[in-house]
Amino acid sequence: MTQKFLICFPQGGINDMWSVMQQTINYCEREDRILVLDTTKNWFRDDWQAYFSILSPVVYKGVTPELITNLLKQDVFPSELQGKTHEELNHVIWVTEGHMSINGIHVSSPLHLSYKESVIVYAYCAMFRDIMQVFPKLQFTEEILTEFRRRRSMLPEKYISVHIRNTDNKSNVDEFIYNNRHILEKAPLFVASDNLNSIQRCKLEFNNVYSFSTIPDLGGENIHESSLSQKLRTTAEETRKWNSDAILDFLLLTQGEIILCSNYYSGFSMSAKRLQEAYSKNEIQPFY
């Protein structure tokens, strides 16, 4: 029997990408396909394999542009992408919620259906999906783990995690600080945010704030896909640091004694909160 494949281009932020990875792993397990993941056609603009691997028999190890080009020579759905090379595939475009396109071709076909073609091309942004299934399967690279340990060593043994989502999803930082002051002023704080002013506000308000990532002033624009954020990543090194900071902020948030979130519409916040609670109850094994 000829092996079938699903080529997936996960969209959205790191939490959304992990959610799509779990969604497509489940599909490939059910449909007996091999999952080929590519994160070079979205804001990440780098190979996910430089940051982590996924411990799953259906996830292809060692994905390359050449592999995808060769797969696209087979029987492909949607058929308009058959014969394309990886280089010819443009950046994925978000048309509307649940509708992504590549080269003007819809690539968010429903995954509750079966497809006869040998290769499916798929892109999606799985906002607010649960990552509790996929996260234990992630094995972070030594480079990520070394930097995580370095940053963790600079934090006190016990700290409170704070995540302020305040670009595309707005937060009332004044209200957040007012409502949580009785907690925030008593313990060391690790603060992660997509908004530079929010981090600076916490540092002005409290003298116990730790923050490591380089967050530029984007004027309230989306940290993932805005034109300004893309202009700030002109080299491979800048992209690698940008992506690593997002992952490392997430990992450090999960290790706090508690986690306070300013915006419950943020999937990044909610996933970090669920993992923090799971770690505090020893329900999952440490990633480090």
Predicted regions and their residues:
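Secretory-pathway glycan-assembly enzymes, especially type II membrane glycosyltransferases
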Residues: T2-K186
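Active-site rim elements
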Residues: C8-G12, E238-T239, N243
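A donor-sugar binding/catalytic signature common to diverse glycosyltransferases
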Residues: G12, Q22, S244-Y288
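Short, well-ordered alpha-helical microsegments
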Residues: M17, M21, N197-Q200, F268-S269
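Short, aromatic/basic amphipathic alpha-helical patches
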Residues: W48-P57, I199-N208, S271-R274
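Short acidic, S/G/P-rich loop/turn micro-motifs used as interaction or catalytic elements
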Residues: T167-S171, N197, G267
